[in-house]
Amino acid sequence: DELLEILDIDKSLLAKVYESPEVTGTILPEIAAKTGLSTSTVVVGGAGDNAAAAVGTGVVEDGKAFTTIGTSGVVFAHSNNISIDPKGRVHTFCCAVPGAWHVMGVTQAAGYSLAWFQENIGTEYARKAKEQGCGAFDLINADVQKTPIGANRLIYLPYLNGERTPHVDPNCRGVFFGLSSMHTT
C-alpha cells in the first residue's frame, strides 16, 4: 500500500494477488465443455515454469535444487530465507511455496545456442539428417561425442541474447574464443 501511495496508483485498478496454491475459482462452463473437464475443476494462482517445476520435482525445502536446459539454462534452488544478490547476478523471487523463496541463475541461450548453431553454421547437418532419416541434433550430438574433452581449447560464450548470470548485461554478445587452424567444422 505504501508503494502504491508513493507512485500515486489507485489500488482498485490492480487485480487481486494470489499465492501460487491458492484457489482462485473454477473453470468456466464453456472451457469445461471444450476440454471435457468438470466445471468443479479448480483454478489456482499458479507459478512460472521453473517455480512450478520445483513443486513437481520436490524442490520445496532448503538444500534442494535442480537444473533445466531449454532455450535458456537455469540452476534453481529453494530457500526458506530471502537472500538478495546486490549485483543481480543471482535472482531471488517468491516461490510457489508460500512464505519461501527461490534463488536462480540463468544463462539466456543454453539450448538456443544449439538451434542457432544448427541453423547458421551446421546447415549441412540438416541435409544429412534428411538423407539419413534422423534429426539434425542426433548427428550433431554424435559429432560432439567424437570431440576431445576441452574441444582443443576452443571456448564458447553463449551470450546470443545478452546475459543474466553471472553478468547482468543485455548487450553481452557470444564469442568463440581460442579459434585456430586446428579447429574445423
Question: What is each residue range found by the language model?
Answer:
Residues 1, 5-6, 23-25, 29-185:
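Active-site core segments that coordinate phosphate-bearing ligands/cofactors
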Residues 9:
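Active-site-proximal cap/lid insertion segments
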Residues 12-22, 103:
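A glycine-/small-polar-enriched, mobile loop at the entrance of the PLP active site in fold-type I
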